[in-house]
A protein has these predicted regions:
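Conserved beta-strand -> loop -> alpha-helix junction used to position metal-binding or nucleic-acid-contacting
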Residues: 115-121, 126-170
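Alpha-helix boundary/capping detector
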Residues: 34, 38, 51, 55, ...
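Alpha-helix initiation and N-capping motif
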Residues: 5, 22, 140-144, 155, ...
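Short hydrophobic/aromatic segments of transmembrane alpha-helices and their interfaces
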Residues: 8, 46, 283-284
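RNase H-like nuclease fold core
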Residues: 4-5, 14-133, 153-154, 295
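Acidic/histidine-rich catalytic cores and adjacent linkers
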Residues: 106, 110, 117-125, 131, ...
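Short, solvent-exposed secondary-structure capping/transition elements
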Residues: 80, 153-160, 208, 336
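Extended interfacial segments that mediate partner engagement and assembly in macromolecular machines
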Residues: 1-5, 9
Length: 349
C-alpha cells in the first residue's frame, strides 16, 4: 500500500509524493503509434505501391472537428495515403493531397487509370487538374441510395394519402348505414400497414416469387406504386456489367422520358435527372474499374468502430498515429498469416 512521505500543502491534504508509485494507466494507449507514423512516411509506400493496380478510391471522413482524407487502392484494398485536417476540406486541400499522391506515383514510374469517389463537388476539378483525363467513376452505391430513399419517400406519401381518405365515425359500433364504410376503412387501414411492413419490396434488387406475389397484393388499386417498382427495375438494369456505357445512357434517356410523362413521379424522382447518375455509369466501358468506393469506405467503417471501442478523446496527432498503426497492421497481415500457417503445420507434424 502506498504511504505518504511528503508534507501535505495547507489544509487540502494533497499527496505530494509516494514511496511506492503505481504504474501509469494504459487505458486507450497502444504501443508503436509514433514509430508507425514515421515508418508510413518512409518505406510504407514502396511496399504498398509495389503491386499498384492503377485504380484508386478517394473519400473524406469526419471525426469531430477533424477530417481525414484517404486514398485506397480500389482493387488491392490497401490504404496508400492519408492526411488529417483540423477543418472541413476545401478544393485547395484536395488539390494538395492529390499532388502528394501524384508525386509518389511519378517517383516510381506509375500511372493512374481511374478514380472512384462519392458525389462531392470537390473532386472533379481536382482530378482533372492533377491526374489529367483519367476515368472518374462516381460510387454506384451512393447513387442508388439516393434513388431508393426517394422511392421509399414516395411510398410514405401514398400511405399518408390513403390515411386521409379514411372515413370518420363516432365512438362505438357503426350503425347499419355505416357498416359498408366501416369495412372499407378496415381494409384501407390494413393496406396502409402492409405498405409500411413491406416497403422494402419497392427497392429490393431481386425478389422471390413469394415477394412478387406480396407486392402485387399490396399494390392492387395503386398503379403509381407499381410504376415505381418498374422504374426501380429499370434503374438496376442500368448498372448491368453486360452493357456498355453508351447503351446504358440510351436506356437512361428512355427512362427519363417515361418518368417525365408523370408529373408526380418527375418531382419525386428528381435524382434520376442528376448528371451524377451518368458519371456512375463510367465503369461499364472498363472491366477493371470498380463501380463502388467500398475499398475506402471499409477503412472508414473500421475507423468508426475504433472510435467507439478504443478511445473517446481525440486529437489530430492521435488520429494520425492510430491510422498509421492500422496501416502497418494491414501491411503485416500476410506475413502473420504465413507465420500462423507454418506453426500449425509444424504442430501437426
Amino acid at each position: 500500500m502506498a504511504s505518504r512521505i511528503g508534507r501535505p500543502p495547507g489544509t487540502c491534504g494533497g499527496i505530494t509524493a509516494s514511496s511506492s508509485p503505481l504504474p501509469r494507466s494504459r487505458t486507450g494507449w497502444k504501443r508503436g503509434e509514433k514509430r508507425a507514423e514515421e515508418r508510413i512516411t518512409r518505406d510504407y509506400l514502396d511496399a504498398a505501391l509495389a503491386d499498384f493496380s492503377g485504380y484508386i478510391a478517394a473519400d473524406e471522413l469526419y471525426d469531430g472537428p477533424y477530417c481525414v482524407l484517404s486514398i485506397v487502392d480500389n482493387r488491392r484494398f490497401k490504404r496508400l495515403l492519408y492526411e488529417v485536417l483540423d477543418h472541413n476540406p476545401t478544393e485547395e486541400d484536395i488539390l494538395r493531397f492529390f499532388r502528394r499522391f501524384q508525386d509518389a506515383l511519378a517517383a516510381r514510374g506509375l500511372t493512374l487509370r481511374g478514380v472512384t469517389t462519392d458525389g462531392s463537388p470537390m473532386y472533379p476539378q481536382a482530378i482533372v487538374e492533377v491526374f489529367g483525363p483519367v476515368e472518374h467513376q462516381l460510387c454506384q452505391f451512393h447513387i442508388l441510395a439516393e434513388l431508393t430513399k426517394a422511392v421509399i419517400k414516395a411510398v410514405a406519401q401514398v400511405r399518408r394519402q390513403l390515411k386521409g381518405t379514411l372515413p370518420r365515425f363516432g365512438r362505438g359500433r357503426p350503425s347499419r348505414a355505416n357498416r359498408r364504410l366501416a369495412a372499407r376503412k378496415k381494409h384501407t387501414e390494413q393496406k396502409i400497414v402492409d405498405l409500411f411492413e413491406h416497403r422494402h419490396l419497392f427497392v429490393q434488387h431481386h425478389l422471390t416469387a413469394a415477394q412478387q406475389k406480396t407486392l402485387r397484393r399490396i399494390t392492387r388499386g395503386l398503379p403509381a406504386l407499381r410504376t415505381l417498382r418498374q422504374i426501380m427495375d429499370e434503374v438496376y438494369r442500368l448498372f448491368d456489367r453486360r452493357c456498355r456505357t453508351d447503351t446504358a445512357l440510351a436506356k437512361l434517356a428512355r427512362l427519363r422520358r417515361r418518368v417525365s410523362r408523370f408529373k408526380g413521379l418527375r418531382q419525386t424522382l428528381g435524382k434520376l435527372f442528376s448528371p451524377n447518375l451518368e458519371k456512375a455509369l463510367t465503369f461499364l466501358d472498363d472491366s477493371l474499374l470498380p463501380a463502388t468506393s467500398n475499398a475506402v469506405e471499409r477503412g472508414n467503417r473500421r475507423h468508426r468502430k475504433m472510435q467507439k471501442t478504443v478511445y473517446r478523446v481525440r486529437t489530430g496527432p492521435h488520429i494520425s498515429q492510430r491510422i498509421a498503426a492500422d496501416m502497418l497492421r494491414d501491411a503485416q497481415a500476410e506475413g502473420r498469416f504465413q507465420t500462423t500457417l507454418t506453426l500449425h503445420l509444424a504442430r501437426a507434424g
